């Protein structure tokens, strides 16, 4: 329009022959040129009635400008969205901003590059496919030739052996011996395929250019989507689909800056990311219950029970209920509920007895000592019908002897406990008066002031049960505790090098890796379920304080639960039920599963796990249930279709074209299965995102952060007596010796 007004102004100037008398002072004037600004025509229009013929061309130019604006507006007008059968669409950049996925930190969930970089990525993938094709054919050709050579060599060896005799010329005998030796060596260790031997062939050039392209591609900066909200995430991705290299490792390599708990099967994530997280200033802890080399930290669940405080019973009940429900059903039956009571009673008794009678209870109680206490109390007896049954007579006798056990003597006991703020062990004197203050309404304390009232009542209840029933109850408790009789597991749960409170309240953020060998996955699932359950119950007790009507959190650091292979932990029914509220307590859950059948098989089809996750990420599924679920979540869009019909008359036929609208899934289940290097992100209340997968090994941004993992786990509790670990010290000494031998020292006494 500005151009049209300039032309209109110029037309009036030309009509008046550049006469300043009529036109006024020009905006720019030189010896050879006079220029009036475009909006001058507006001032001159006040003389239209005196000389309208001067403005004929100007009006035409202005009209032409308005016409151009109208045409451009029509061309640039966005096409109206078709919504009659569905309004689903893919998210754009504005949607990502509203979804708060443009963040400098958080959980890394996808790659969102420009169109140009996406094109480069596609070309790199095509080159990779072509390279793999060429190398595969070359390797097949090599194997075919190799097989023929290997088939001929034994025949040649036999021929040479027949020729190798006393009548053969010595020079020839020497040649034959060398050939036979070389042939036998070839058979013993045949050469392997080597791409370098294919120089100046298309195969070698494809391989060379692919490696060169990857090297250049790694230097490109990329844009990553990150979720730093307080809402949960769920990933549904089949095995070997790239969730580790695309989600877990990028998140741990600096993206998530607060505390994190990683369910780390095979210790891969520890090996790749622990070094960098330690460099970030985190305390990098590895808890591997089956470790025997001293590299793992240790954790005793019984240390989480603060005896001599009002919290002791609730914490003991929580711990006992989780242990007794070793299958994670979340709905205890009669035997499980009573086994919970037995376990709670025994562990509370052992906790107090360690301080009351250190001669008979010399070591702090552990799950091993609880299991051993119960195991030694079961005997097998033959009833009157000749059937052998489990009897708890030994346990009944022990319980009867302990009913009136004095847990707090008149002089009191000195309880040793860890002070998380001072980071040291402290001794607290506990007396019978303190016990009375905790249980002011207990009548048993009137006659037995040193006997713990809860333990007393529990032992009385236990001893009053019939032998057969009690035998089954104790047997249920033993079944729940049987894994802790393993010497390795007992050793790694004998003392605590860290505690649950440290994860969110230590002075530094903590990165905890729960390492499980695949061979022990099912066996160790109960202790990891125990850890997660206790973590939630401990930190979800109080949401914080309120200042000026706003909540102020109690924790120092948020904590991410990065639960890779979530289903491998077994049934976490009670944990799954907490997903609806624990986000408000600073805990963010990142669940990773292989497919919906895996979740439904454990929690049932009516589970609410995915419903409680704000963000859901889908890789190409390999089962129909997941594909159908994702298709439904994406929704329907409206498309326009055209149909043609031809009416063939006698002389002249004609074609009739009709347009109609119909519903279509934004992406069908079949299309989801063929996504290859793409992923779908579905967020509540926002359009879904179709984006690319991350491969951290293709970007120097992540490769430069790869640092060797620590040789041993960090520990928070470092008391030289209570937390002594000879194997750990041996590993550290060995590392120190290697470091000193590798260090350059200048000796001034060395002469030339």
State where each predicted segment sits.
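Residue-level signal for threonine
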Residues: 92, 366, 668
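Membrane-proximal cytosolic interface modules of multi-pass membrane proteins
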Residues: 84-118
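Transmembrane alpha-helical segments in integral membrane proteins
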Residues: 50-81
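P-loop NTPase motor domains
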Residues: 5-18, 79-87, 114-220, 224-587, ...
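Conserved ATP-driven motor cores of ASCE-family P-loop NTPases powering translocation/secretion/packaging/pilus
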Residues: 579-581, 585-680
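Membrane-interfacial helical/loop segments at transmembrane boundaries in membrane proteins
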Residues: 12-51
């Amino acid at each position: 329009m500005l151009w049209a007004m300039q032309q209109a102004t110029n037309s009036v100037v030309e009509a008046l022959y550049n006469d300043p008398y009529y036109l006024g002072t020009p905006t720019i004037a030189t010896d050879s040129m006079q220029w009036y600004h475009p909006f001058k025509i507006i001032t001159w229009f006040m003389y239209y009635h005196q000389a309208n013929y001067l403005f004929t061309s100007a009006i035409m130019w202005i009209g032409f400008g308005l016409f151009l604006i109208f045409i451009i507006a029509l061309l640039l007008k966005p096409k109206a969205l078709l919504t009659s059968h569905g309004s689903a669409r893919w998210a754009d950049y504005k949607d990502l901003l509203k979804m708060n996925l443009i963040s400098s930190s958080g959980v890394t969930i996808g790659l969102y590059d420009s169109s140009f970089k996406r094109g480069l990525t596609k070309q790199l993938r095509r080159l990779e496919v072509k390279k793999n094709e060429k190398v595969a054919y070359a390797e097949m050709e090599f194997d075919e030739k190799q097989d023929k050579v290997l088939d001929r060599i034994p025949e040649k060896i036999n021929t040479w052996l027949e020729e190798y005799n006393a009548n053969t010329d010595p020079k020839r005998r020497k040649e034959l011996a060398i050939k036979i030796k070389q042939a036998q060596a070839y058979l013993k260790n045949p050469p392997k395929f080597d791409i370098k031997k294919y120089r100046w062939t298309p195969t070698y050039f494809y391989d060379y250019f692919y490696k060169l392209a990857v090297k250049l591609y790694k230097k490109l900066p990329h844009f990553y989507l990150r979720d730093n909200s307080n809402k949960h995430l769920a990933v549904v991705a089949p095995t070997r689909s790239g969730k580790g290299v695309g989600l877990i490792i990028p998140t741990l390599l600096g993206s998530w800056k607060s505390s994190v708990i990683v369910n780390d099967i095979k210790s891969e994530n520890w090996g790749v990311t622990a070094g960098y997280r330690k460099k970030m200033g985190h305390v990098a802890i590895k808890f591997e219950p089956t470790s025997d080399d001293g590299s793992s930290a240790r954790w005793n669940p019984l240390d989480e029970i603060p005896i001599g405080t009002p919290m002791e019973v609730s914490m003991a009940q929580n711990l006992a209920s989780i242990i007794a429900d070793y299958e994670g059903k979340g709905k205890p039956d009669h035997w499980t509920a009573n086994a919970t009571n037995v376990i709670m009673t025994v562990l509370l008794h052992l906790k107090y007895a360690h301080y009351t009678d250190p001669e008979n209870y010399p070591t702090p109680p552990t799950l091993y000592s609880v299991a051993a206490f119960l195991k030694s109390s079961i005997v097998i007896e033959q009833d009157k019908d000749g059937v052998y049954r489990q009897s708890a007579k030994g346990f009944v006798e022990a319980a009867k002897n302990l009913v009136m056990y004095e847990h707090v003597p008149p002089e009191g006991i000195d309880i040793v406990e860890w002070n998380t703020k001072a980071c040291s062990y402290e001794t607290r004197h506990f007396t019978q008066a303190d016990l009375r203050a905790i249980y002011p309404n207990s009548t048993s304390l009137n006659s037995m002031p040193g006997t713990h009232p809860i333990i007393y009542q529990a032992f009385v209840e236990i001893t009053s049960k019939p032998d057969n029933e009690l035998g089954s109850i104790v047997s249920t408790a033993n079944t729940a505790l049987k894994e802790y009789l393993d010497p390795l597991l007992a050793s790694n749960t004998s003392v605590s090098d860290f505690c649950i409170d440290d994860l969110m309240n230590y002075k530094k953020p903590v990165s905890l890796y729960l390492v499980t060998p695949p061979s022990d996955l099912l066996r160790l699932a109960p202790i990891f379920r125990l850890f997660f359950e206790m973590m939630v119950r401990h930190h979800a007790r109080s949401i914080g304080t309120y200042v000026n009507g706003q909540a102020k959190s109690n924790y120092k650091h948020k904590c991410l639960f990065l639960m890779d292979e979530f289903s491998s932990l077994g049934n976490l029914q009670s944990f799954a039920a907490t997903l609806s509220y624990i986000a408000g307590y600073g805990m963010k859950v990142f669940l990773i599963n292989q497919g919906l059948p895996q979740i439904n098989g454990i929690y049932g089809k009516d589970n609410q796990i995915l419903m409680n996750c704000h963000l859901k990420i889908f890789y190409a599924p390999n089962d129909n249930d997941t594909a159908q679920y994702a298709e439904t979540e994406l929704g329907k869009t409206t498309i326009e279709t055209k149909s043609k019909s031809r009416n063939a008359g006698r002389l002249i036929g004609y074609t009739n074209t009709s347009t109609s609208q119909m519903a279509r899934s934004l992406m069908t289940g079949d299309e989801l299965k063929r996504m290859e290097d793409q992923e779908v992100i579905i967020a509540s209340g926002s359009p879904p995102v179709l984006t690319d997968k991350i491969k951290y090994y293709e970007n120097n941004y992540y490769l430069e952060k790869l640092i060797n993992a620590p040789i041993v786990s960090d520990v928070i509790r470092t008391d030289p007596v209570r937390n002594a670990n000879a194997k750990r010290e041996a590993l550290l000494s060995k590392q120190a010796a290697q470091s000193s031998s590798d260090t350059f020292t200048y000796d001034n006494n060395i002469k030339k």
